[in-house]
A protein has these predicted regions:
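Eukaryotic small-GTPase/lipid signaling interfaces
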Residues: 1-475
């Protein structure tokens, strides 16, 4: 996200630039007692002072990075619609002061800045405005600030543009959600009811695609489509779930976690699909080598999430125990992949590779070099670690805004990766197979695995015996 935007520069008039730096201008000076800065950067403050710092005046407009960070992090402490109501009251107070004071001429400039703030809010977090009561509050605020403008004036035009764009953004999100739900439902329901042995005519991955690069490209398509539906506030919702001591009311909103759960489920489905493809009777060695090549191509593309899912599928017990099969596989490539995903030293090797992909993306000469899809589970763990080692509040009661600057930076970085347009041609046939192909349940995976290579030790023999007994009793 750019440091500054002049989206409504034409509405502000001479001397009313939308630019501003954290802590600069009238608002920053007035709130200095409740706001703490280090090297010109806001690091803490009371929630009330932070809210006042968000609202522009006739002579002050907050930095855009502060707007994004505060709107994102404030939901840990206050619901968005409550924040909007508070912003409305502060704006009304400002307007009354301008009307009663000697600077009434600045009223239009102030109104334009308020609309600019609301516009940035609706663009960055349109989901905050899906409720009718919030929309009513938004209309009430804009109605009040627009009273100083003539009919057809710049402020009223900006308000009209904002109110027209917001429903479109909400509708687009709803359409993406419906599409994702259609794709997710079969994948989540298919596993437990499947038999161990597939019909002879059932397709397998090699029958659908025999080119590792093409399959890696289609996996990248699916990744970007799914991760692209995640919004910044969805990620912030993770923090609301983490702290069991936090009694904040908006925790657990299913609508704000559905995108995250769907993306997490995709990882599990891909891992199970990999395991299913391997334990099928025919061509196990060939399938393993093919999938290793697919994982390597994912790594080269920058699709680390699919790569990790493939490796995870190969490391599931029903696959990992197939010693005879693995003995025939040329594992040098797999060893390299496991080295990149080695969990030691906090996944140091993976983080080095991710940093390299990020640098490549920043200096990309082609769209193919821009792809960066991190391992989502590790990103969430990093967020969790950052959340746990830093408190939300300082001993003096101030919000620890330094913490939320860092959280916002990481979320913004993640969101930038999700907005990359997939540079590869879409193959509907391959994607359909990846998304809808039947996968084995955990029990079925073990049945197929033991039927391919019998149990080799007492523990495996006991497990196989118990599994057969369970299946016979169920039948």
């Amino acid at each position: 996200m750019p440091q500054t935007a002049l989206v409504l520069a034409s509405t502000l008039g001479p001397g009313c630039s939308a630019q501003g730096r954290p802590g600069m201008g009238e608002r920053g000076a007035r709130g200095s007692e409740d706001l703490v800065f280090q090297d010109g950067r806001l690091v803490s403050g009371s929630l009330e002072a932070l809210m006042e710092h968000l609202v522009p005046t006739a002579d002050y407009y907050p930095d855009r990075t502060y707007i994004f960070t505060f709107l994102l992090s404030s939901r840990v402490f206050i619901r968005p619609h409550d924040l909007l109501a508070r912003v409305g009251r502060i704006c009304l107070e400002q307007r009354r002061q301008l009307e009663a004071g000697p600077e009434k001429a600045k009223l239009k400039c102030f109104s334009a800045r308020v609309v600019q703030l609301l516009k940035e809010w609706t663009e960055a977090f349109p989901y905050d405005f899906q409720d009718e009561t919030v929309m009513a509050e938004l209309k009430a605020i804009t109605h009040r600030v627009a009273q100083c403008d003539e009919e057809g004036g710049t402020v009223k035009k900006a308000i009209a543009q904002m109110t027209q764009s917001l429903p479109l953004a909400l509708a687009a999100r709803g359409q993406r959600q419906e599409l994702r739900d259609k794709l997710c439902s079969p994948a989540l329901d298919r596993g437990p009811v499947l038999k161990a042995k597939p019909p002879a005519a059932q397709k397998d991955i090699l029958g659908v695609c025999c080119d590792p690069l093409v399959l890696a490209q289609q996996l990248t398509h699916i990744e970007l489509e799914r991760v692209g539906s995640i919004r910044p506030e969805d990620l912030m919702q993770i923090l609301s779930h983490m702290d069991s001591r936090d009694k904040h009311r908006c925790r657990g909103d299913p609508a704000k976690t559905r995108s995250l759960e769907a993306y997490d489920d995709w990882f599990d489905c891909l891992s199970m699909l990999v395991a299913t493809e391997v334990v099928k009777k025919k061509h196990r060695t060939r399938v393993l080598e093919f999938l290793i090549d697919v994982a390597r191509e994912c790594f080269n593309i920058g699709n680390f999430n699919s790569m990790m899912a493939i490796i995870s599928g190969m490391n599931l017990s029903p696959v990992a125990r197939l010693k005879k099969t693995w003995s025939k596989v040329k594992t040098a490539k797999f060893d390299v992949l496991e080295h990149h995903m080695d969990p030691s030293s906090n996944f140091c090797n993976y983080r080095t590779a991710l940093q390299g992909a990020m640098q490549r993306s920043q200096t990309a000469n082609s769209s193919r070099e821009k792809v960066v899809i991190p391992v989502f589970n590790l990103f969430v763990k990093d967020m969790y670690f950052l959340h746990k080692i830093h408190t939300n509040h300082l001993p003096n009661g101030h919000v620890n805004f330094k913490k939320f600057w860092e959280i916002s930076r990481q979320i913004h970085e993640f969101m930038a990766w999700t907005q990359v347009e997939c540079p590869f041609e879409k193959d509907k046939k391959i994607q359909s197979y990846l998304l809808t192909a039947p996968v084995y349940s955990e029990e079925a995976l073990f049945v197929a695995s033991f039927e391919s290579e019998g149990p080799e030790n007492h523990m495996e023999k006991d497990s196989w015996k118990a599994l057969r007994t369970t299946l016979l009793n169920r039948a």
